[in-house]
UniProtKB/Swiss-Prot annotation:
One of its GO terms (biological process) is L-arginine biosynthetic process. N-acetylglutamate synthase involved in arginine biosynthesis. Pathway: Amino-acid biosynthesis; L-arginine biosynthesis; N(2)-acetyl-L-ornithine from L-glutamate: step 1/4. This is Amino-acid acetyltransferase, mitochondrial. It is an enzyme of class 2 (transferase). PANTHER family: AMINO-ACID ACETYLTRANSFERASE, MITOCHONDRIAL (PTHR23342:SF4), N-ACETYLGLUTAMATE SYNTHASE (PTHR23342). It comes from the Eukaryota. Belongs to the acetyltransferase family. Residues 414-439 are annotated as: Disordered. It comes from Ajellomyces capsulatus (strain NAm1 / WU24). GO terms for molecular function: L-glutamate N-acetyltransferase activity. The gene is ARG2. Residues 415-434 have a biased composition (Polar residues). GO terms for cellular component: mitochondrial matrix.
Length: 684
């Protein structure tokens, strides 16, 4: 967080430059201060602010022209500052809002001809069962959506009351909840519009949904309004109102906004059709898919955190889907007759899926009692709702398939998406000492494009970041961040060949393996470290000791791991020699353009400690490395090597209890020769 308000003032002042004496700069700074509190570091705030791009200055209008338009210019755009457009192309939304106007008539919508033709960046929001929320909570959700709109993220909200289609009053109840959402938004100073006639139901057996006209939706969005759509469809031909699934509405909107709703006719010219679709795609960018559901984020019965904080769909969709289906199949048989030390029942799935020995584990082979899923906290893991969780995950998977890789989704409970989420909901927590305020996951995600908590943090660190002073106060993470993500390639595949010390002292693979693109790996290392690698020296050093390689995506991130012998231990291939080999993280790399976003580092780190080397790994880092804070949070232990500039990290259990293991780790971390061209044979 920031040391003092002047930090954020300086950050904002670097991009907000106004030539007008009438612009409420202090109000703008206060607005950004409240939002950037959702960013955990100054680097994240700077990263967000750096996305503001200056626009080309437009010729100044003469005074008569300005007078004819009926309001004075605020000079936001003219000064080269784009408060929303630099990030989302929506300067008009913020510039046109009453908060930034100085006369009574300024709250009125702009004429259509003045609306910007820049790309419109949209968040598709589905809110489930709003009827379960009181007016105060719904009002705070409306406030968050209003703030997203002010930041240039136009919101299109789909109401999902979850009513059975047999409900006689489904239409009135759906419209009532849509109107409640409208009131909640407008209470916070942003206009909204209910659109209950934009969805058509095809007469085909599949009853596919489509959008009547994209302009009916885009027009209010371009003018800074928030669109609210109830799950009402109209049959083609008869125009009879019928209930439709909110998930299908979200998918129909996604297809329409991506230009995939265009229906080709036999007489269409293919080139003209492609040009038209391309133009439609440039008009709109769906950047976020947001699901607000009382069920919350995707649960996990295999992790100490009880939840999936980040889902890399490319890698994990099938695995998590199977896990949720297992939960659905278990049904009421989830609860066994077994009880923990507190006399509470535990889940059978926990017994059949014990935790792996990974960095998340907090020093015990079995699930700690304070993290067990008991009959008293069944609602916290949503045991009856596995099917709903599967539906939410499937919706994001299907929708993100239509969208570019930069788009992302988030699932959260409505209460955590309110601006009062930092207030303790449980009076018993009032005395708990917390060092960090709870973040609004929607605002945090907008600012950082990351989940509110890192996916590679151990469960104990999640407790600390949640402001919990004891294990018993640990809360399940209610939000799940979802990306289309990237494939993860492991050499060798641990499902086929377990990563273990080589026999006869030689590794079964090298970096010259034809499956490895060595030039791209070298480029990844050099880009990440910003140093030139002595490739031949590096190959000679790791060729006979390579444990494996982890590659994320198209060499966007990766890790090189080796088996190292401590000083004085002969490399004779004996069992004694193999037992002393240390699993060592030689290189942990992420391309500069992927650092701090996309979850690349988390994906690689999780693969290392959960799949490849679950028993532990060690590594070293220079003491002045800015990444050390990230390492400290994920390591089980650290040690500043005396007489050197190195800090040693490890994720292995019992390192401090076994003196020889600790000395082996220290000896390896002291003795590794660097392979950089600037000091290629010098040990620090």
């Amino acid at each position: 967080m920031y040391d003092e308000p002047s930090d954020i003032v300086r950050l904002v002042s670097t991009v907000i430059v106004s030539e007008s004496e009438h612009i409420p700069v202090l109000a703008i700074i206060d607005f950004f201060f409240s939002l950037l509190s959702s960013a955990s570091t100054k680097r994240e705030a700077q990263s967000y602010l750096s996305r503001f791009k200056a626009e080309k200055p437009e010729p100044a209008k003469s005074p008569p022209e300005q007078s004819a338009m009926g309001y004075p210019s605020t000079n936001f755009v003219q000064s080269g500052v784009n408060l929303g457009g630099g990030m989302f192309g929506m300067a008009g939304v913020i510039d046109n809002h009453a908060m930034f106007r100085q006369e009574s008539a300024l709250g009125k919508s702009l004429p259509i001809e003045t609306v910007s033709e820049e790309t419109l960046h949209i968040a598709l929001v589905k809110i489930r069962e709003p009827q379960l929320l009181n007016d105060q909570t719904l009002g705070e959700v409306g406030r968050t959506l209003s703030q997203l709109s002010l930041l240039g993220m136009s919101c299109c909200v789909v109401i999902d009351p979850g009513l059975p289609q047999s409900d006689t009053f489904w239409r009135n109840r759906s419209i009532k909840q849509a109107d409640r959402m409208l009131a909640a938004i407008e209470k916070n100073g942003v206009d909204s519009r209910r659109l209950d006639d934009v969805i058509r139901l095809a007469p085909s057996p599949k009853h596919a949904l489509s959008v009547v006209s994209r302009e009916l939706i885009l027009s209010p969005l371009r003018r800074g309004k928030i669109a609210v759509i109830p799950p009402i469809g109209y049959t083609e031909g008869t125009l009879r109102a019928v209930p439709v699934l909110a998930d299908d509405v979200v998918l129909a909107l996604t297809r329409e906004f991506t230009g995939l709703g265009v229906k080709a006719r036999p007489e269409d010219n293919p080139h003209e059709l492609a040009r038209r679709i391309s133009k439609l795609q440039k008009e709109v960018s769906v950047d976020r898919l947001i699901i607000l559901d009382p069920a919350g984020g995707i649960p996990s019965l295999k992790r100490a955190s009880k939840s999936h904080v980040f889902v890399n769909l490319e890698q994990e969709f099938e695995e998590i889907t199977n896990e949720l289906r297992e939960g659905m199949a278990a049904g009421d048989s989830l609860v066994t007759g077994d009880k923990n030390e507190n006399g509470q029942q535990i889940l059978s799935l926990e017994k059949s899926n014990p935790l792996s020995t990974v960095v998340e584990r907090e020093g015990a082979a079995s699930l700690p009692s304070e993290l067990q899923v008991t009959s008293s906290d069944r609602s916290s893991v949503h045991i009856p709702d596995f099917e709903r969780h599967l539906d939410n995950l499937t919706l994001l998977h299907n929708a993100l398939t239509y969208l570019p890789p930069a788009s992302s989704g988030i699932i959260s409970i409505p209460q955590d998406a309110t601006n009062s989420a930092s207030e303790p909901r449980d009076p018993s927590q009032l005395s708990t000492v917390a060092t960090r305020r709870k973040r609004n996951p929607l605002i945090h995600n907008l600012l950082t494009d990351k989940p509110s908590h890192s996916a590679s943090l151990p469960a104990g660190r999640l407790r600390a970041n949640n402001g919990c002073s004891s294990q018993n106060n640990f809360q399940v993470m209610h939000s799940t961040f979802v990306k289309k993500g990237m494939p993860l390639t492991l050499f060798p595949d641990p499902r086929v060949h377990i990563w273990k010390p080589p026999i006869n002292g030689k590794s079964r693979m090298t970096l010259n393996d034809p499956h490895i693109d060595l030039p791209r790996l070298v480029q990844l290392i050099e880009d990440s470290f910003n140093r030139k690698l002595d490739v031949q020296h590096y190959l000679n050093r790791v060729s006979d000791r390579l444990a494996g390689l982890i590659i994320a995506g198209e060499y966007e991130g990766g890790a090189v791991l080796t088996w190292e012998l401590p000083p004085g231990v002969p490399n004779d291939g004996s069992e004694e020699s193999r037992s002393r080999m240390v699993p060592y993280l030689d290189k942990f790399t992420v391309l500069k353009r992927s650092q701090g976003a996309g979850g690349v580092a988390d994906i690689v780190f999780n693969a290392m400690v959960r799949t490849c080397l679950p028993k532990g790994v060690c590594w070293r880092s220079r003491r002045d490395n800015p990444v050390n804070k990230w390492y400290f949070e994920r390591a089980r232990g650290t040690w500043k090597l005396p007489g050197s500039n190195w800090t040693m990290f490890w994720t292995t259990d019992g390192v401090l209890e076994g003196d020889r293991l600790f000395r082996d780790y220290e000896g390896v971390c002291r003795g590794i020769e660097p392979s950089w061209l600037d000091n290629k044979h010098v040990v620090d």
